[in-house]
């Protein structure tokens, strides 16, 4: 079975009520809420708690100052702020970007500090769409294998896999197959995107018009025959 979710940001407060209604009317199964760590009042999320709907969190990424693999990043301070929202809504999954850096020991220490078995680490593109010359960690098979040595819970993003494969000049579908087998995810990010770019893009799915989009659709259907996925 496939569960489908609706993506919102914590800054989309004007959409919260409508999103909850879509869950109640079974258009979607749950909400993935991206948390912008701007110190907002936790009571802003009361609508979700009162509605008692399933929810997952996408933890902040580097654009909002959270980089758990960078030793100079105040990840512990940001996490303490995030913990308030996590405790309030009790999300069933926490999606985490490894972001940019090379020190896996730092990531391991941060994961130990977070002490959260709900964390799902997402594969990354190689290049940043925001900062020139920034290289992400978690874009290659070798790096995912290194992460798997210290953490076993993943979210697979098809758009990021496509972008990474193009950056590496390797076959996109074969790369995705190997990565999915290695990560063994139950949680996926799907979107429409331009085919010939290294940049990570996420557009609304309007049509399944490319070979990789068809691959994505068929892959999810085949995995869902064996286990429940989101």
Which role fits each region the language model picked out?
Residues 1-81:
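N-terminal pre-domain/capping segments
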Residues 2-8, 29-33, 55-59, 92-96, ...:
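Hydrophobic faces of well-ordered beta-strands that scaffold small-molecule active sites
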Residues 7-11, 34-38, 58-62, 99-101, ...:
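Active-site beta-loop-alpha junctions enriched in small/polar residues
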Residues 23-24, 86-87, 181:
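Non-catalytic positions within long, well-ordered alpha-helices that form the structural scaffold/packing
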Residues 49-62, 113-118, 144-149, 212-226:
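Alpha-helix-loop-beta-strand connector modules within alpha/beta enzyme cores
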Residues 65-74, 132-137, 162-228:
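Gly/Pro-rich active-site loop or hairpin
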